[in-house]
């Protein structure tokens, strides 16, 4: 997630030595894209310097030769009315703050979740085990639901859970699982409770809720559903780029992608005297999908929205957008009021509001069900 004006408020990060994969990237160069057509070769250290200045980017070093970013997306007709209120409300009733607190306590206990560290690998393995357990306990695995690791050229893997539907067209919800201490990426303590442990456990709890519905569990929903947990977001949207580039190359159809990056911090709004709200990202997203999401929020959530801008390549929805798939993002607040502790050793669970995270989980359940069922 990006820093922007949050930078000025960020706490000082402390470097703590820990086990890691000994990778020397000081001399290695990476090709990044900072805006459409604006590319630059940088070292890993220069990547983090850009991030500290609030500059986001795609790392396109491993992009296929001849890749062309999408300039337009296919026209998709989204529902204009709510059709599955009874089913969604039944799912929402099962959402549990206690589950989210338990999962986030564990996820943020890893020394860090840096994409090149042993800890990043261990945390991804633990997270995938939780996803598999949810699928198994729901009985969905008997109808073809599965979770797979998506391997990259770094140690942390991405995770994709698939619940088949009657159509191969996919409804995607995603969140990045990695964390970073920008002062000491490889070895520094980076609990990443909000960025983005909060989004990761939000969609995990939403998956539990969605799999309470037997129509979905038994593969009878109109569309296929996928939940994604991306590796390497902080280093340039690496995991999500790889996944959506593969989907483009193999001709997969994505009806819509909703990104959840930071879902738990409300103090910035409270301190300003603002009503606690969702931050609806309005730039580099699908306007029609975002309009559909506004309808879902109005129906199923108890808080309003504030429009906000995130910038180019600010989070994983941008990877879907770049590959021609309609995407949207809803954040915990307006971007200028995000958690000031992100990317430090102070991004702790104690700063988060689980009632707010439940609102995000309600949104995810409503989004998936109304679009897929």
Curated annotation (Swiss-Prot):
Residues 1-18 form the signal peptide. It comes from the Eukaryota. Gene3D superfamilies: Zn peptidases. GO terms for cellular component: extracellular region. One of its GO terms (biological process) is proteolysis. Binds 2 Zn(2+) ions per subunit. Zn(2+) 2 binds at residues 195, 234, 343. Monomer. This is Leucine aminopeptidase 1. It comes from Trichophyton equinum (Horse ringworm fungus).
